[in-house]
Amino acid sequence: MFLKGYTSNVVLIILTFFILLTKEEKNIKNNISGYCFLNFGLKKNAIIKKREKQNLKLFCYNGIRIGQGYDIHKIKVLDEEYNTYANNDFNKNEQSFKTLTLGGVKINNVLVLSHSDGDIIYHSIVDSILGALGSLDIGTLFPDKDEKNKNKNSAIFLRYARLLIYKKNYDIGNVDINVIAQVPKISNIRKNIIKNISTVLNIDESQISVKGKTHEKLGVIGEKKAIECFANILLIPKNS
């Protein structure tokens, strides 16, 4: 009796499994399963109608690339005591304090410790471009141990990254930048920064966003000892 009931249950399970497989195969052929993934709240008929109306293409990668860049540097405010030179434990080369440059704009009352000109905005954008293109990072391409890069204008790095975009047949969709600093006040120089980035990258100013955030006087940034920047970029294939 037990064996008979067990056999019946096994047959029922196999039959149910077969029906589900057949149904799923039909859904795959009709490309319904993918639509169920995107529109799990809709009934099947509604999904089919929506498909016919919008002619959606699922799981289609069109080559769009996104990159993120970051940079941070030590700073000194001129109304505070500072040394003109400082040793970097992570680098055998001696880095020097120089006038801070942000997006090509000189900030005369703030010094930055760096090997090149220390423009964290340009550096972050370069790194975001390199990341989006799957290239090497800025520190590898332009090492701070190389004397050729000492005090170098970071616009040169940015032009190099722009050339890579051109060679790989991409256009810039937009650039989004976040500067985290207690000083200087970004709103006072935002327009000039955007104009400079627009010129170097050869894109419209409307494609660039520059935002400034303080650190609420917390940590080394809040104590005016450092400044950092995040940059995100969207690259679009020219043939899309």
Curated annotation (Swiss-Prot):
The record marks H115, T214 as: Transition state stabilizer. This is 2-C-methyl-D-erythritol 2,4-cyclodiphosphate synthase, apicoplast. GO terms for cellular component: apicoplast. Its cofactor is a divalent metal cation. NCBIfam families: ispF. InterPro entries: MECDP_synthase, MECDP_synthase_CS, MECDP_synthase_sf. GO terms for biological process: isopentenyl diphosphate biosynthetic process, methylerythritol 4-phosphate pathway; terpenoid biosynthetic process. Pathway: Isoprenoid biosynthesis; isopentenyl diphosphate biosynthesis via DXP pathway; isopentenyl diphosphate from 1-deoxy-D-xylulose 5-phosphate: step 4/6. One of its GO terms (molecular function) is metal ion binding. Belongs to the IspF family. It comes from Plasmodium falciparum (isolate 3D7). It comes from the Eukaryota. Keywords: Apicoplast, Isoprene biosynthesis, Lyase, Metal-binding, Plastid, Transit peptide. In the mevalonate-independent isoprenoid biosynthetic pathway, converts 4-diphosphocytidyl-2C-methyl-D-erythritol 2-phosphate into 2C-methyl-D-erythritol 2,4-cyclodiphosphate and CMP. Homotrimer. 4-CDP-2-C-methyl-D-erythritol 2-phosphate binds at residues 71-73, 115-116, 137-139, 142-146, 181-187, 212-214. It catalyses: 4-CDP-2-C-methyl-D-erythritol 2-phosphate = 2-C-methyl-D-erythritol 2,4-cyclic diphosphate + CMP. A divalent metal cation binds at D71, H73, H123. Its EC number is 4.6.1.12. Signal peptide: none annotated.
